[in-house]
A protein has these predicted regions:
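Short, contiguous acidic/charged loop-to-helix segments that flank catalytic cores in large enzymes
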Residues: 124-126, 378-379, 409, 455-457, ...
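Proline-centered turn/helix-capping motifs that create local helix->coil transitions or kinks
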Residues: 13-20, 49, 205-210, 545-559
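Phosphate- and divalent-cation-binding pockets in alpha/beta enzyme and binding domains
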Residues: 154-159, 323, 445, 504
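Conserved "right-hand" nucleotidyltransferase catalytic core of DNA-directed polymerases
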Residues: 1-2, 6-7, 12-125, 165-167, ...
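Short active-site oxyanion
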Residues: 141-147, 310, 430-433
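Conserved catalytic core of nucleic-acid polymerases
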Residues: 219-222, 276, 332, 384, ...
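Function-dense linear segments that define catalytic or interfacial modules
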Residues: 110-114, 188, 192-215, 232-234, ...
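Charged catalytic and DNA/RNA-contacting regions of genome-maintenance
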Residues: 109-114, 130-249
Length: 596
């Protein structure tokens, strides 16, 4: 049957007599058991392909530096290493530094030269406080980015602190954070650890931390896998040391060194202090809030069961789909292999006509609030009654800061029960919270970068920018603009920044696609300079493969050259938005540094 089908396919669909200068034999896979293939599969995490290399001798050979790894615990030797590190760091040369810690400092890896690579564990006279003091000595003399390391925010707390304000006595000029530097060069990469740095900048394949230590904690590795821990500490410090100059040169050649020097490196210390300070939480208020949510969820559950005529798992899309589209006979049910879609956008269209759907949406929102915030935040409250979250510099491709453990940037504000969660965050006694933000920063950046005179004039005259846009787009006097016209103009203003299509705008405003298309066309007719500017952003990105902010932050956009329409369209939207959103991120970071 398959043979017949194949013959029919060739006969009906495939033209076999096209003259092509290509030998089918050339398409055969040759011997791919070589170092280049191994590095490629490792780079893209092709786990199944990597397994094929396990019984070959291709797997990364030990770099030459391995023979120079040396564990030292003799006090005099350790002193000599730190004294030499101070001599180097106080000049113009660099050292590599890797901090090995879990909750407590366990060891350090220090690279002084290609042949001087040391592992210094906490042992005997070499106590944790001694190591911290000697590291502080080394850092105190460095002022020319002499210490190459990575993720330095994670261990700034070990250095000597100011006795008055508790800030680390560390010059931000002491370090070059190779992870942040590599992030600026390749913001879409998944990792910036020493293994990635070695592959990217040294063309060397190092064993990863996971390959060396598996799932062992640092404390367990000290006792159970010391040889591999030595490798990890020495390899990482060596990689930082070897990469530092190459990364610096590349940043300068790409005109990004100023961004690194004046924004990203100083910001490390701002974020560190934010993490150290944390934010105070009224734990009892959080518990009470959880109870209120729990009660509301139970009431909604009962009402949903009554409307459905039976009890079922509301959290199961499959069961919910059957109830809504089969039992209750609601329209527009789209059935897939796994059942009916019950995504938010599907339910939101049904909600105006079916009260039970509104209750289901509210049930979902309240359940999310309870699990993620009311109950979820409790586990992050430290002994001091504060949440000390993590702020990340190398996660987003846009340059924005992200927040994890927990995500404090995503606390909901649109629904009343969501707003209530913010009340559990309280200032210290005698203090108040101050909320400061830029007004319409992205629209102002658009006006500045495009040079559009009408938009600039509207801002300079302190006009209501959305009302001014409505007057331009709808051709009416400013004082005759209706609230609906202003609302539509606001959606267009922000939609333009995010590269919104006519379809997206029509969904946003609940209007026809034709009307949305007309709005966008009127907008560009009113602001032709913006149209030229945005088209230029897209064409530049197509030519270069990336976009740039005003501060030369780069966003790689491989999708913009895709043959796939959807991917290419996504790339074009990114090209329109990334320079504006990225510039806004840079300006906010500068403001944080100035306030700090």
């Amino acid at each position: 049957l398959s043979l017949v089908g194949s013959e029919m396919c060739i006969r009906d669909r495939i033209k076999t007599d096209v003259p092509i200068k290509y030998n089918i034999e050339d398409a055969k896979a040759g011997d791919f058991f070589n170092e280049n293939s191994y590095e490629l599969f490792k780079k893209y995490n092709f786990k199944n392909m990597l397994k094929k290399f396990e019984n070959t001798d291709i797997i990364a050979k030990d770099p030459e530096c391995y023979e120079y790894f040396k564990k030292i615990s003799d006090f005099a030797e350790v002193e000599n290493v730190f004294n030499k590190a101070m001599d180097i760091a106080g000049g113009i040369e660099k050292i590599g530094l890797s901090i090995v810690r879990e909750s407590e400092l366990a060891a350090v890896g220090i690279t002084l030269s290609d042949t001087e690579i040391y592992y210094i564990p906490v042992s005997g006279f070499v106590t944790e406080s001694y190591l911290a003091d000697r590291l502080s000595d080394v850092v105190s003399v460095a002022s020319n980015r002499n210490i190459a390391s990575a993720n330095i925010k994670d261990y700034l707390d070990i250095f000597e602190k100011d006795k008055i304000n508790g800030y680390p006595l560390v010059s931000e000029k002491a370090f070059i954070d190779t992870a942040i530097a590599a992030y600026l060069l390749h913001p879409s990469n998944e990792s910036y650890d020493y293994e990635s740095l070695g592959r990217e900048f040294l063309s060397l394949t190092y064993p990863s931390k996971t390959e060396l230590l598996g799932k062992l904690s640092i404390n367990k590795a000290v006792n159970e896998a010391e040889n591999n821990l030595i490798k990890y500490a020495c390899l990482s410090s060596y990689a930082y040391y070897k990469c530092a100059d190459k990364i610096t040169e590349q940043l300068k050649s790409e005109n990004m060194y100023e961004l690194f020097e004046t924004i990203e490196m100083p910001l490390i210390f701002v974020l560190f202090e934010m993490q150290q300070q944390g934010i105070s939480v009224d734990k009892q208020a959080l518990v009470d809030y959880s109870k209120v949510l729990g009660t509301k969820i139970l009431v909604l559950e009962k009402e949903i069961y009554e409307a459905a005529g039976e009890e079922f798992n509301i959290n199961s899309p499959k069961q919910l789909g059957v109830i809504l589209f089969e039992k209750l006979g609601m329209p527009n049910g789209k059935k897939t292999k796994s059942g009916y879609s019950t995504a938010a956008d599907v339910l939101e269209k049904l909600a105006p006509d079916y009260p039970v759907v509104s209750k289901i949406l509210e049930y979902r929102q309240l359940s999310k609030l309870k699990s993620t915030y009311a109950d979820g935040l409790t586990q992050y409250i430290s002994e001091d009654g504060r949440i000390h979250g993590t702020f990340n510099q190398t996660i987003t491709a846009t340059g924005r800061i992200s927040s994890t453990d927990p995500n404090l940037q995503n606390i909901p504000i649109r629904m009343e029960m969501g707003k209530a969660i913010r009340k559990v965050f309280v200032p210290k006694n005698g203090f108040v919270f101050l909320d400061a933000d830029y007004s319409q920063i992205e629209l102002r950046i658009l006006a500045h970068m495009s040079g559009d005179e009408k938009l600039i004039e509207a801002y300079n005259s302190s006009a209501d920018i959305h009302r001014a846009t409505a007057a331009q787009v709808f051709g009416v006097p400013l004082d005759e603009v209706t609230d609906e016209q202003r609302r539509n103009a606001k959606a267009v203003n922000f939609g333009i920044i995010y590269g919104m299509s006519s379809f997206g705008l029509s969904q946003d405003l609940s209007i026809s696609r034709k009307e949305a298309k007309e709005y966008i066309e009127r907008y560009f007719a009113s602001y032709p300079t913006i149209k030229t500017f945005i088209d230029g952003l897209v064409s530049d990105a197509k030519e270069k493969g990336y976009s740039l902010t005003m501060y030369n932050r780069r966003r790689e956009i491989p999708e913009i050259k895709s043959s796939n329409f959807m991917q290419r369209s996504f790339g074009e939207r990114v090209a329109m938005n990334a320079p504006i959103q990225g510039t806004a991120a840079d300006i906010i970071k500068l403001a944080m540094i100035n306030v700090y």
